[in-house]
Amino acid sequence: MSALLPVFQQTSTLRDGQTIPLWAGPAPGALGTEESDIPAITVFLPRTMTQNTPAMIVCPGGGYVNLAANHEGRQVANYLNSLGLAAFVLRYRLGPRYHHPIELGDAQRAIRTLRSKAGEWRLDPGRIGIMGFSAGGHLAMSASTHFDSGVASAADIVDRSGSRPDFTVLGYPVISMTEPWTHQGSKNSLLGTNPDPELAKSLSGEVAVTKETPPTFIFQTNADTTVPAENSVYYYLALRKAGVPAEMHIFEKGAHGVGLANDDPALSEWSKVLANWLRGRGIIK
């Protein structure tokens, strides 16, 4: 893996396995200079890159306190590569050291970075998605419901690009930050132990959806006792009510945090169903 280099010190050609910090200097709100203080994306490239390759930012879960960077990061990125997508695993900052809006800002910056560098990196600026699992699913959902079109006059060229993802993929996501369906550990890590109720509500996907929320694919298991399936169900219903194209698959069996679930013949089908959804939306061939 290459040394960490700020995004604007990278060459125009991406290298598989390189890790790219999202800011040239200290990230906004940084509390130190350790790796955990430096949000970054790690690059995973498909065997063949076209001039307009679709891309996916992958947000591993971990309760907003750890990152499951292998089975919800690298392994997923490799699978996305097999479908022809360039994948970028996001290392976002975590609680309890960091709280909202730091995590959301890191995800938004990743989207802006890919869009602003699309020409140089041979990415399609109109096919940039975000994907997340568990708490990383909450982050991906938050980026899909809280975005802007960029600031044309911004001194930082990355900030001139919009932060809305073009499509969203959620695996057993934390959606709600309110009772009774929230995952309390994720909520505490993101918002602290006594958050403003209105802030918690605003970060609950079931009420944050608008008609501008990107098309969304969701998978979940009915047997998940860590993040109840109601998180996915109520988010899907909110998407449906807003007229947002959405597809949800709830599998009967399967624990939380399974990633690709390669050891489960039934649950592992979710990744194949996702591939069909991506093809149906014209994201991959």
Where are these regions (language model features)?
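Active-site nucleophile elbow and catalytic-triad environment of alpha/beta-hydrolase enzymes
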Residues: 39, 154-158, 193-208, 213-214
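C-terminal catalytic histidine-bearing segment of alpha/beta-hydrolase fold enzymes
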Residues: 44, 219, 229, 233-285
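Short beta-strand element of the alpha/beta-hydrolase
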Residues: 52-61
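Active-site glycine-rich loops that stabilize anionic/oxyanionic intermediates
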Residues: 60-65, 222
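Catalytic nucleophile-loop/oxyanion-hole region of alpha/beta-hydrolase
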Residues: 68-70, 74-76, 90-125, 261-269
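Primarily recognizes the serine-hydrolase "nucleophile elbow" in alpha/beta-hydrolase
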Residues: 109-186, 200-201, 205
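Short beta-strand/loop motif that positions the catalytic acidic residue
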Residues: 218-220, 224
